[in-house]
């Protein structure tokens, strides 16, 4: 195993669901970052905000992060940008979802502004149209199938 635990930070539950699925499949304990015991190697799962993997810096201070799953809404992840955030480990992307009602404070303000900005210009293709619809109405793209490469890497 390339990690002895799974640690996550979740905002609206999509990342937590992936962490729990991975823990069950790999037989590893799963912890919310805030409650995780310090030390040991970890696969970290964090949600994306403005291209940054939320909580990764804190996870790296507390654990040896050997791999990371960035969970986001788009079907076109910026893998170079994501991989640069953990150059010494493996970075995966999992398409999660969006729940506007679950957003609060700054996150809600940022997403509301992003939706308004997207609405001002016509979507350039079907993917952009789908992203706008998901942001407006909410969406859930969590699937076990997306975890296959992560499970293979964990078994290493």
Stretches with model-predicted labels:
Residues 113-156:
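Glycine-rich phosphate/pyrophosphate-binding loop and the adjoining helix
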Residues 13-16, 100, 144:
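Loop/helix-junction capping segments adjacent to catalytic residues or to phosphate/diphosphate-binding pockets
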Residues 1-61, 152-156:
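N-terminal beta1-alpha1-beta2 submodule of the flavodoxin-like/Rossmannoid cofactor-binding fold
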Residues 34-107:
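Helix-loop-strand module that forms the ligand-binding subsite of alpha/beta enzymes
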């Amino acid at each position: 195993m390339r990690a002895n635990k799974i640690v996550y930070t979740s905002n609206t539950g999509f990342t937590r669901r992936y962490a729990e699925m991975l823990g069950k499949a790999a037989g590893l304990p799963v912890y919310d970052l805030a409650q995780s015991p310090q030390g040991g190697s970890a696969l970290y799962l964090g949600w994306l905000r403005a291209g940054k993997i939320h909580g990764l810096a804190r996870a790296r201070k507390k654990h040896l992060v050997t791999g990371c799953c960035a969970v986001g809404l788009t079907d076109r992840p910026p893998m170079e940008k994501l991989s640069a955030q953990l150059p010494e480990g493996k970075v995966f992307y999992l398409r999660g979802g969006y729940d506007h009602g679950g957003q609060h404070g700054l996150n809600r303000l940022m997403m509301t502004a992003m939706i308004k900005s997207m609405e001002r210009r016509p979507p350039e293709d079907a993917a952009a149209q789908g992203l706008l619809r998901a942001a407006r109405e909410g969406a859930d793209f969590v699937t076990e199938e997306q975890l296959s490469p992560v499970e293979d890497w964990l078994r290493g």
